[in-house]
């Protein structure tokens, strides 16, 4: 099997069970197939092993023509307005969030299909810079601020870990005091 080909059910994780793949996995498979088709239709045809960040950028620009997000040009009277009151001739583009998610899925698919992380064209610096530029441009043109989402769950687990560490420190201090005083402390203190 080449890196673009799909694994047979026997090769896939789980051994071909009846469980349906998640929405993310299905989308990742479709994205990978679309990118493989793009490589095959490229003139001259392009092998994945020779694919670079520049080819990924070419693919993202190709996808831009199928976008559904209105991105106002600098000369448009609605530039910077999130909800324009009337239609305008500005082009439809791929939204930054869609491109960012697509690159993330393709980056994962590349490595799942045998690619080395250090040679992953979807993680190239040029691709990251392109996505950042698209985000900034669309943010200004559409009047929408893109802010990084914070992980609430991670913060809650971090607080819990801190509390557990503090309890262990207090228990160790109590054990040291008891030992210094010469009395016995039950082992249940450490559970």
UniProtKB/Swiss-Prot annotation:
Stated family:
Belongs to the plant homeotic and developmental regulators ALOG protein family.
Motif segment (Nuclear localization signal): 148-152
Instruction: Write down the Pfam families for this protein, in alphabetical order.
Output: ALOG_dom
Q: Which residues form a coiled coil?
A: 152-179
- Put simply, this protein is called Protein G1-like1
- Its principal location? nucleus
Q: Which GO terms describe its molecular function?
A: DNA binding
Which GO biological process entries does UniProt record here? mRNA transcription; post-embryonic plant morphogenesis; response to light stimulus
Q: Where is the ALOG domain?
A: 23-150
Native source organism of the sequence: Oryza sativa subsp. indica
């Amino acid at each position: 099997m080449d890196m673009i080909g799909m694994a047979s059910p026997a090769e896939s994780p789980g051994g071909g069970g009846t469980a349906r793949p998640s929405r993310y996995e299905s989308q990742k498979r479709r994205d990978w197939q679309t990118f493989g088709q793009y490589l095959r239709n490229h003139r001259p045809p392009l092998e994945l092993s020779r694919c670079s960040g520049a080819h990924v950028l070419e693919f993202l620009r190709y996808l831009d023509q199928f976008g559904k997000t209105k991105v106002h040009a600098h000369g448009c009277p609605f530039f910077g307005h999130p909800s324009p009151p009337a239609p305008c001739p500005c082009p439809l583009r791929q939204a930054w969030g869609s491109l960012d998610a697509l690159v993330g899925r393709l980056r994962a698919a590349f490595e799942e299909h045998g690619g080395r992380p250090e040679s992953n064209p979807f993680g190239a610096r040029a691709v990251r810079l392109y996505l950042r530029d698209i985000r900034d441009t669309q943010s200004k043109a559409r009047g929408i601020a893109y802010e990084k989402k914070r992980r609430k769950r991670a913060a809650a687990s971090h607080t819990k870990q801190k509390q557990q560490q503090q309890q262990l420190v207090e228990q160790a201090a109590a054990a040291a005091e008891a030992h210094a005083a010469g009395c016995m402390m039950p082992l249940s203190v450490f559970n």
